[in-house]
C-alpha cells in the first residue's frame, strides 16, 4: 500500500505530514464532529464529511489540479446521493442504517477513482469493494456514545482502499447493490430501487 508511506497527507489545522489514509480519516472525523455538515435531502446523506477529506488527500497524492479535485468531488457527490436514494431513505433508516456511512464509501471510491484515473472496469470494482465494506448503525443513539464520527471516517478509508486496490488489480462485486445473495438493497432496505442509481 504505497500511499501509506508517511507523507502526502495533511491533517487540517496541524503541522507536518502523515500518510493520506490517516489524514483523510482524522479530517473526516473532524468534519462530522460538530454536526454542521451539509445534507442531501433526498438521500439524507452528509456527503462532504467523507468526500472532501478523501478527495483532498487523494488529490494531494496525485498532485491534481483544482479543477481535477472539484470534478472528483462532484463525481463523489453524485454517487453518494444516488446510492442513498436507491437504498430507500425511510426504510434504510428504520432498519438502523446510517446513510452517511453506508453510502459514503461509494462516494469516496468514485472521487478517488476519478483522481487515480481508473477505467470503467476498475471503477466498478472499486464501487463493489466500497459496498462490501459498507456499514454504519444508529445504535450510538441509545446511550449517547460519541462514535458517530467514525462513520464518515471509515467511509473515507473504505473508499480510498477500494480505489487504490482496484487500481492495483483487485476486483469487487459488480452487482453489490442488486445481487440476490448479499446485495445491499435487499439487506439494508425494504424499498430499495436500483433504478434510482441512474435517474
Regions found by a protein language model. Give the residues of each.
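N-terminal core-entry segment
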Residues: 1-198
Amino acid at each position: 500500500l504505497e500511499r501509506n508511506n508517511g507523507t502526502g497527507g495533511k491533517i487540517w489545522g496541524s503541522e507536518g505530514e502523515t500518510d493520506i489514509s490517516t489524514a483523510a480519516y482524522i479530517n473526516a472525523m473532524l468534519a462530522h464532529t460538530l454536526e454542521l455538515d451539509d445534507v442531501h435531502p433526498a438521500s439524507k446523506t452528509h456527503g462532504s464529511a467523507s468526500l472532501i477529506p478523501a478527495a483532498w488527500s487523494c488529490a494531494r497524492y496525485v498532485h491534481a489540479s483544482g479543477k481535477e479535485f472539484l470534478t472528483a468531488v462532484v463525481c463523489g457527490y453524485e454517487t453518494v446521493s444516488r446510492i442513498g436514494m436507491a437504498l430507500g431513505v425511510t426504510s434504510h433508516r428504520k432498519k438502523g442504517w446510517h446513510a452517511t456511512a453506508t453510502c459514503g464509501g461509494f462516494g469516496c471510491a468514485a472521487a478517488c477513482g476519478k483522481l487515480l484515473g481508473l477505467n470503467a472496469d476498475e471503477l466498478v470494482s472499486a464501487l463493489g469493494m466500497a459496498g462490501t465494506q459498507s456499514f454504519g448503525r444508529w445504535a450510538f443513539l441509545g446511550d449517547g456514545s460519541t462514535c458517530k464520527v467514525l462513520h464518515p471516517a471509515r467511509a473515507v478509508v473504505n473508499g480510498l482502499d477500494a480505489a487504490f486496490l482496484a487500481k492495483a488489480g483487485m476486483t469487487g462485486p459488480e452487482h453489490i447493490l442488486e445481487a440476490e445473495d448479499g446485495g445491499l438493497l435487499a439487506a439494508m432496505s425494504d424499498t430499495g430501487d436500483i433504478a434510482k442509481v441512474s435517474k
